[in-house]
Amino acid sequence: MHPAAEHSPLGKSSEYIATYSPEQLFPIPRTAKWAELGVTAQTLPWQGVDYWNCFELSWLLPSGKPVVAIGEFAIPADSPNIIESKSFKLYLNSLNQTVFTSLGALQVCLEKDLSAAAGKPVGVKVRTLAEVEAQGVVALPGQCIDALDVAISNYEQPQPELLRCNPERVVEETLHSHLLKSNCPVTGQPDWGSVVVQYKGRALDHASLLTYLISFRQHADFHEQCVERIYLDLKNLLQPEHLTVYARYVRRGGLDINPYRSTGPISPDNKRLVRQ
Protein backbone atom coordinates (compact mmCIF):
# COMPACT_ATOMS: atom_id res chain seq x y z
CA MET A 1 0.00 0.00 0.00
CA HIS A 2 1.14 3.55 -0.67
CA PRO A 3 2.05 4.93 2.79
CA ALA A 4 0.04 8.13 2.27
CA ALA A 5 -3.03 6.13 1.28
CA GLU A 6 -3.18 4.60 4.76
CA HIS A 7 -4.34 7.98 6.06
CA SER A 8 -6.89 8.58 3.30
CA PRO A 9 -10.66 8.01 3.68
CA LEU A 10 -10.48 5.04 1.31
CA GLY A 11 -11.70 1.85 2.95
CA LYS A 12 -12.94 3.69 6.04
CA SER A 13 -16.40 4.66 7.22
CA SER A 14 -16.95 8.31 6.30
CA GLU A 15 -19.53 10.96 7.04
CA TYR A 16 -21.00 12.38 3.85
CA ILE A 17 -20.99 16.16 4.12
CA ALA A 18 -23.51 17.93 1.88
CA THR A 19 -22.12 21.48 2.03
CA TYR A 20 -18.95 22.80 0.43
CA SER A 21 -15.92 21.11 1.99
CA PRO A 22 -12.69 21.36 -0.06
CA GLU A 23 -10.70 19.93 2.85
CA GLN A 24 -12.18 16.53 1.92
CA LEU A 25 -9.69 16.30 -0.96
CA PHE A 26 -6.77 14.01 -0.06
CA PRO A 27 -3.65 14.33 -2.26
CA ILE A 28 -1.25 11.40 -2.57
CA PRO A 29 2.28 12.18 -3.83
CA ARG A 30 3.22 10.38 -7.04
CA THR A 31 6.91 10.25 -6.10
CA ALA A 32 6.83 6.99 -4.11
CA LYS A 33 5.32 5.02 -6.98
CA TRP A 34 7.58 6.72 -9.50
CA ALA A 35 10.56 5.63 -7.37
CA GLU A 36 9.35 2.01 -7.58
CA LEU A 37 9.50 2.35 -11.36
CA GLY A 38 12.93 3.98 -11.32
CA VAL A 39 11.82 7.44 -12.47
CA THR A 40 11.67 10.86 -10.86
CA ALA A 41 9.71 14.03 -11.50
CA GLN A 42 12.75 15.33 -13.39
CA THR A 43 13.17 12.22 -15.58
CA LEU A 44 9.62 11.25 -16.52
CA PRO A 45 9.75 9.35 -19.84
CA TRP A 46 6.17 10.24 -20.75
CA GLN A 47 3.72 13.04 -21.26
CA GLY A 48 0.13 12.51 -20.30
CA VAL A 49 -3.06 13.22 -18.47
CA ASP A 50 -5.47 11.47 -16.11
CA TYR A 51 -9.07 12.01 -17.17
CA TRP A 52 -11.61 11.70 -14.36
CA ASN A 53 -15.31 11.66 -15.22
CA CYS A 54 -17.86 12.34 -12.48
CA PHE A 55 -21.43 11.15 -12.92
CA GLU A 56 -22.69 12.35 -9.52
CA LEU A 57 -22.22 16.11 -9.84
CA SER A 58 -25.03 18.25 -8.43
CA TRP A 59 -25.44 21.68 -6.85
CA LEU A 60 -28.14 24.27 -6.07
CA LEU A 61 -29.23 27.37 -7.95
CA PRO A 62 -29.94 30.53 -5.91
CA SER A 63 -33.64 29.57 -6.12
CA GLY A 64 -32.89 26.32 -4.31
CA LYS A 65 -33.52 24.22 -7.40
CA PRO A 66 -30.91 21.46 -7.90
CA VAL A 67 -28.92 20.94 -11.07
CA VAL A 68 -27.23 17.72 -12.21
CA ALA A 69 -24.38 17.47 -14.71
CA ILE A 70 -21.35 15.40 -15.64
CA GLY A 71 -17.91 16.65 -14.71
CA GLU A 72 -14.77 16.00 -16.72
CA PHE A 73 -11.44 16.69 -15.04
CA ALA A 74 -7.98 16.56 -16.66
CA ILE A 75 -5.14 16.12 -14.16
CA PRO A 76 -1.64 16.47 -15.68
CA ALA A 77 0.38 13.25 -15.47
CA ASP A 78 3.36 15.20 -14.14
CA SER A 79 1.41 16.80 -11.30
CA PRO A 80 3.03 16.21 -7.89
CA ASN A 81 -0.09 14.44 -6.58
CA ILE A 82 -2.91 12.18 -7.55
CA ILE A 83 -6.19 12.73 -5.71
CA GLU A 84 -7.42 9.75 -3.71
CA SER A 85 -10.69 8.65 -5.28
CA LYS A 86 -12.94 8.42 -2.22
CA SER A 87 -11.84 11.86 -1.07
CA PHE A 88 -12.65 13.13 -4.57
CA LYS A 89 -16.14 11.64 -4.24
CA LEU A 90 -16.63 13.13 -0.76
CA TYR A 91 -15.58 16.54 -2.05
CA LEU A 92 -17.99 16.37 -4.99
CA ASN A 93 -20.79 15.25 -2.67
CA SER A 94 -20.11 18.31 -0.52
CA LEU A 95 -21.37 20.45 -3.41
CA ASN A 96 -24.83 18.87 -3.32
CA GLN A 97 -26.39 21.48 -1.01
CA THR A 98 -24.11 24.32 -2.03
CA VAL A 99 -25.44 27.31 -3.99
CA PHE A 100 -23.58 28.52 -7.09
CA THR A 101 -24.84 31.59 -8.90
CA SER A 102 -23.71 30.31 -12.29
CA LEU A 103 -22.06 27.41 -14.07
CA GLY A 104 -18.97 29.59 -14.40
CA ALA A 105 -18.80 30.06 -10.62
CA LEU A 106 -18.95 26.30 -10.11
CA GLN A 107 -16.23 25.71 -12.67
CA VAL A 108 -13.92 28.29 -11.09
CA CYS A 109 -14.43 26.64 -7.69
CA LEU A 110 -13.67 23.17 -9.05
CA GLU A 111 -10.56 24.37 -10.88
CA LYS A 112 -9.23 26.13 -7.78
CA ASP A 113 -9.76 23.23 -5.37
CA LEU A 114 -8.64 20.40 -7.65
CA SER A 115 -5.56 22.30 -8.84
CA ALA A 116 -4.56 22.96 -5.23
CA ALA A 117 -4.86 19.25 -4.40
CA ALA A 118 -3.05 18.03 -7.53
CA GLY A 119 -0.32 20.66 -7.28
CA LYS A 120 -0.77 21.71 -10.91
CA PRO A 121 -3.60 23.30 -12.93
CA VAL A 122 -6.47 20.88 -13.53
CA GLY A 123 -8.75 21.26 -16.54
CA VAL A 124 -12.48 21.24 -15.76
CA LYS A 125 -15.50 20.83 -18.02
CA VAL A 126 -19.07 20.68 -16.71
CA ARG A 127 -21.30 19.08 -19.35
CA THR A 128 -25.05 18.70 -19.60
CA LEU A 129 -26.64 15.25 -19.66
CA ALA A 130 -28.02 15.92 -23.14
CA GLU A 131 -24.56 16.78 -24.42
CA VAL A 132 -23.02 13.56 -23.12
CA GLU A 133 -26.01 11.47 -24.19
CA ALA A 134 -25.69 12.75 -27.77
CA GLN A 135 -22.03 11.73 -27.82
CA GLY A 136 -22.89 8.10 -27.04
CA VAL A 137 -20.21 5.44 -26.63
CA VAL A 138 -17.27 4.62 -28.88
CA ALA A 139 -15.16 1.58 -29.75
CA LEU A 140 -11.45 1.45 -29.04
CA PRO A 141 -9.17 1.92 -32.05
CA GLY A 142 -7.04 -0.81 -33.57
CA GLN A 143 -7.03 -4.59 -33.31
CA CYS A 144 -8.61 -6.35 -30.32
CA ILE A 145 -6.31 -9.12 -29.04
CA ASP A 146 -8.76 -10.69 -26.57
CA ALA A 147 -9.69 -13.68 -28.77
CA LEU A 148 -6.10 -14.98 -28.84
CA ASP A 149 -5.59 -18.39 -27.23
CA VAL A 150 -3.27 -17.89 -24.26
CA ALA A 151 -2.58 -19.76 -21.02
CA ILE A 152 -1.62 -18.18 -17.70
CA SER A 153 -1.77 -19.24 -14.05
CA ASN A 154 0.12 -16.52 -12.13
CA TYR A 155 -1.87 -13.34 -11.54
CA GLU A 156 -0.16 -11.93 -8.42
CA GLN A 157 2.28 -9.50 -10.04
CA PRO A 158 2.81 -8.02 -13.50
CA GLN A 159 5.27 -10.17 -15.39
CA PRO A 160 7.21 -8.16 -18.00
CA GLU A 161 9.25 -11.26 -18.79
CA LEU A 162 6.17 -12.60 -20.58
CA LEU A 163 6.49 -9.89 -23.23
CA ARG A 164 8.16 -10.87 -26.50
CA CYS A 165 9.00 -9.04 -29.70
CA ASN A 166 10.81 -9.49 -33.01
CA PRO A 167 13.80 -7.14 -32.87
CA GLU A 168 14.43 -7.59 -36.60
CA ARG A 169 11.05 -6.21 -37.62
CA VAL A 170 9.71 -2.70 -37.05
CA VAL A 171 5.97 -2.09 -37.23
CA GLU A 172 3.47 0.64 -36.46
CA GLU A 173 0.21 -0.63 -35.01
CA THR A 174 -2.62 -0.10 -32.55
CA LEU A 175 -3.79 -2.92 -30.27
CA HIS A 176 -6.39 -3.04 -27.52
CA SER A 177 -7.74 -5.34 -24.83
CA HIS A 178 -10.71 -5.28 -22.45
CA LEU A 179 -9.13 -7.85 -20.10
CA LEU A 180 -7.15 -5.49 -17.88
CA LYS A 181 -7.96 -5.87 -14.19
CA SER A 182 -6.12 -4.91 -11.04
CA ASN A 183 -7.14 -4.34 -7.42
CA CYS A 184 -7.33 -1.22 -5.30
CA PRO A 185 -4.24 -1.27 -3.03
CA VAL A 186 -6.29 -0.06 -0.05
CA THR A 187 -9.67 -1.83 -0.24
CA GLY A 188 -8.83 -4.78 -2.49
CA GLN A 189 -11.84 -3.98 -4.69
CA PRO A 190 -11.45 -4.86 -8.38
CA ASP A 191 -10.63 -2.19 -10.94
CA TRP A 192 -11.80 -3.22 -14.43
CA GLY A 193 -10.27 -1.57 -17.47
CA SER A 194 -9.72 -1.51 -21.20
CA VAL A 195 -6.35 -0.49 -22.61
CA VAL A 196 -5.01 0.76 -25.94
CA VAL A 197 -1.37 0.36 -26.99
CA GLN A 198 -0.20 2.40 -29.97
CA TYR A 199 3.44 2.22 -31.00
CA LYS A 200 6.06 2.23 -33.73
CA GLY A 201 8.93 -0.07 -32.83
CA ARG A 202 10.01 -3.69 -32.61
CA ALA A 203 7.13 -5.97 -33.58
CA LEU A 204 5.32 -6.95 -30.39
CA ASP A 205 4.03 -10.50 -30.08
CA HIS A 206 0.30 -10.01 -29.59
CA ALA A 207 -0.29 -13.12 -27.48
CA SER A 208 2.53 -12.15 -25.15
CA LEU A 209 0.99 -8.70 -24.68
CA LEU A 210 -2.37 -10.24 -23.77
CA THR A 211 -0.78 -12.64 -21.29
CA TYR A 212 1.19 -9.78 -19.75
CA LEU A 213 -1.93 -7.64 -19.33
CA ILE A 214 -3.77 -10.54 -17.71
CA SER A 215 -0.89 -10.93 -15.23
CA PHE A 216 -2.09 -7.69 -13.56
CA ARG A 217 -5.29 -9.45 -12.48
CA GLN A 218 -4.46 -9.71 -8.75
CA HIS A 219 -1.93 -6.87 -8.66
CA ALA A 220 -2.70 -4.15 -6.11
CA ASP A 221 -2.02 -0.65 -7.37
CA PHE A 222 -3.75 2.55 -8.40
CA HIS A 223 -4.95 2.99 -11.99
CA GLU A 224 -2.28 5.56 -12.82
CA GLN A 225 0.62 3.41 -11.65
CA CYS A 226 -0.64 0.34 -13.54
CA VAL A 227 -0.63 2.32 -16.79
CA GLU A 228 2.81 3.76 -16.09
CA ARG A 229 4.17 0.27 -15.41
CA ILE A 230 2.72 -1.02 -18.69
CA TYR A 231 4.19 1.96 -20.52
CA LEU A 232 7.68 1.45 -19.10
CA ASP A 233 7.72 -2.31 -19.65
CA LEU A 234 6.74 -1.84 -23.30
CA LYS A 235 9.17 1.03 -23.77
CA ASN A 236 12.05 -1.04 -22.41
CA LEU A 237 11.23 -3.97 -24.69
CA LEU A 238 10.26 -2.27 -27.93
CA GLN A 239 12.66 0.70 -27.96
CA PRO A 240 9.86 2.51 -29.80
CA GLU A 241 10.00 5.58 -31.96
CA HIS A 242 6.71 6.48 -30.33
CA LEU A 243 4.48 4.78 -27.75
CA THR A 244 1.10 5.53 -26.20
CA VAL A 245 -0.71 3.56 -23.49
CA TYR A 246 -4.26 4.70 -22.70
CA ALA A 247 -6.52 2.87 -20.22
CA ARG A 248 -10.22 3.50 -19.67
CA TYR A 249 -11.43 2.10 -16.35
CA VAL A 250 -14.94 1.15 -15.33
CA ARG A 251 -16.75 3.58 -13.04
CA ARG A 252 -16.68 3.06 -9.27
CA GLY A 253 -18.34 5.37 -6.76
CA GLY A 254 -19.62 7.61 -9.53
CA LEU A 255 -16.11 8.24 -10.92
CA ASP A 256 -14.09 6.68 -13.69
CA ILE A 257 -10.33 7.22 -14.12
CA ASN A 258 -8.61 7.13 -17.50
CA PRO A 259 -4.79 7.49 -17.49
CA TYR A 260 -2.97 8.38 -20.74
CA ARG A 261 0.82 8.15 -21.12
CA SER A 262 2.70 8.87 -24.35
CA THR A 263 6.07 9.77 -25.83
CA GLY A 264 4.35 12.43 -27.92
CA PRO A 265 2.05 15.41 -27.47
CA ILE A 266 -1.04 14.90 -25.34
CA SER A 267 -3.95 14.32 -27.71
CA PRO A 268 -6.42 11.79 -26.28
CA ASP A 269 -10.14 12.11 -26.56
CA ASN A 270 -12.30 11.46 -23.52
CA LYS A 271 -15.14 9.43 -24.99
CA ARG A 272 -16.93 6.69 -23.06
CA LEU A 273 -16.63 3.00 -23.83
CA VAL A 274 -19.55 0.59 -23.61
CA ARG A 275 -18.62 -0.41 -20.02
CA GLN A 276 -18.45 3.21 -18.92
UniProtKB/Swiss-Prot annotation:
Subunit structure: Homodimer.
Binding-site positions, substrate: I83, E84, S85, H223, E224
HAMAP family in UniProt: QueF_type2
Subcellular location: Cytoplasm
Pfam family, one: QueF_N
Principal EC category: oxidoreductase
Organism: Pseudomonas putida (strain ATCC 47054 / DSM 6125 / CFBP 8728 / NCIMB 11950 / KT2440)
Protein task: Catalyzes the NADPH-dependent reduction of 7-cyano-7-deazaguanine (preQ0) to 7-aminomethyl-7-deazaguanine (preQ1).
GO molecular function, one term: preQ1 synthase activity
Residues annotated to bind NADPH: S85, K86, R252, G253
Keyword terms: Cytoplasm, NADP, Oxidoreductase, Queuosine biosynthesis
Gene name per UniProt: queF
Reactions catalysed according to its record: 7-aminomethyl-7-carbaguanine + 2 NADP(+) = 7-cyano-7-deazaguanine + 2 NADPH + 3 H(+)
Pathway entry: tRNA modification; tRNA-queuosine biosynthesis
GO cellular component labels: cytoplasm
Active-site feature positions: C184 (thioimide intermediate), D191 (proton donor)
Family per similarity comment: Belongs to the GTP cyclohydrolase I family. QueF type 2 subfamily.
Gene Ontology annotations of biological process type: queuosine biosynthetic process; tRNA modification
Transmembrane segments: none
Protein name: NADPH-dependent 7-cyano-7-deazaguanine reductase
Alphabetical list of InterPro entries matching this protein: GTP-CH-I_C/QueF, NADPH_dep_7-cyano-7-deazaG_red, QueF, QueF_N, QueF_type2
EC number per UniProt: 1.7.1.13
